[in-house]
Design a protein with these regions (language model features):
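Rossmann-like NAD(P)(H) cofactor-binding subdomain of soluble oxidoreductases
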Residues: 29, 53-138
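Internal alpha-helical scaffold of NAD(P)-dependent oxidoreductase catalytic cores
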Residues: 92, 115-120, 135-238
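Short catalytic/ligand-gating loop segments at beta-alpha or beta-beta junctions
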Residues: 238-244
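Short, solvent-exposed loop/turn elements at beta->coil junctions and helix N-caps
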Residues: 128, 179-182, 245
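Short, charged/polar "capping" segments at the starts of alpha-helices
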Residues: 35-38, 109-110, 157
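NAD(P)+-binding Rossmann beta1-loop-alpha1 motif at the extreme N-terminus of oxidoreductases
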Residues: 1-52
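A structural signal for isolated positions on well-ordered beta-strands in alpha/beta enzyme cores
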Residues: 4, 27, 98-100, 122, ...
Length: 245
């Protein structure tokens, strides 16, 4: 299977390495020229949760035209780069190509669908899955708990189960999920509660929850996000957002 990883940062390096080692034809693209040049000259080194090794056979480039059409595109950019990645993919992919993006925030599916058919798109959410870049050509795999994947329109399909299978075979812990939108929103509500307030107030999660005033502000965001989800008719697994977080 020809797989293209779009965005060869920390997470992209994990995806590219494991799929390459599973026997797939893997290409990876990134705009960070120093990183790409380092991989071309001395390979991609990945260490950590999935083991330590250096791979010299990864096809890397800064030009999407070098990759061309692929069976599967994995968008591994940060959220701000999703639309650009989708535009790149749209310029070379076919109607039979599948695109998967693993983003924990909202809106990735909508941004990608502007550049290709939403029927080609699979969404993913990572839980306890982390990685970091040590330097050009060198990444660290911090942890790998679970990736949930699902159809944009919901349901369990044959292609979703096929993707679950090839990700499993590459060493990932992956589960096909019937309602990925529910999962994305539930994670979003948690992020609204903790991520922004902790950043703004420069507090850890524990410190935030121990401060009555700041915690009340954080829960205001929780409740607002919950109300928006209800208006959008998202099928959440809870009715009390405060108890949930």
């Amino acid at each position: 299977m020809k797989i293209a990883v779009v965005g060869l940062g920390a997470m992209g390096s994990v995806y590219a390495t494991l799929f390459l080692e599973a026997g797939h034809e893997v290409w990876a693209i990134d705009e960070w020229e120093e990183h790409i040049d380092a991989i071309k000259s001395r390979g991609l080194t990945l260490e950590g949760a999935s083991g330590s090794r250096t791979n010299y056979n990864l096809n890397v480039t800064t030009k999407m035209s070098d990759i061309g059409n692929s069976d599967l595109y994995i968008i591994a950019t940060k959220a701000s780069g999703v639309a650009k990645a989708a535009k790149w993919i749209g310029s070379v992919s076919s109607s039979n190509s599948l695109i998967i993006t693993i983003q924990n925030g909202l809106g990735a599916g909508e941004r990608i669908s502007k550049h290709m058919s939403s029927n080609q798109l699979i969404l993913g959410v990572a839980e306890g899955f982390g990685a970091s870049i040590i330097g050009p050509g060198h990444a660290h795999h911090n942890s790998m708990k679970l990736i949930r994947i699902g159809e944009l329109t919901g349901g369990i399909t044959d292609r979703l189960l096929f993707l679950e299978k090839i990700w499993h075979e590459a060493g990932f812990k992956v589960k096909a999920f019937e309602d990925i939108t529910q999962l994305i929103w539930e994670k979003f509500i948690c992020n609204v509660t903790f991520s922004a307030p902790c950043t703004v107030f420069n507090k850890t999660i524990g410190e935030l929850m121990e401060d009555p005033c700041l915690w009340e502000i954080a829960l205001g965001g929780t409740k607002e996000a919950f109300r928006i989800a209800k208006v959008k008719q998202i099928n959440l697994s809870f009715e009390d957002p405060v108890a949930y977080v």
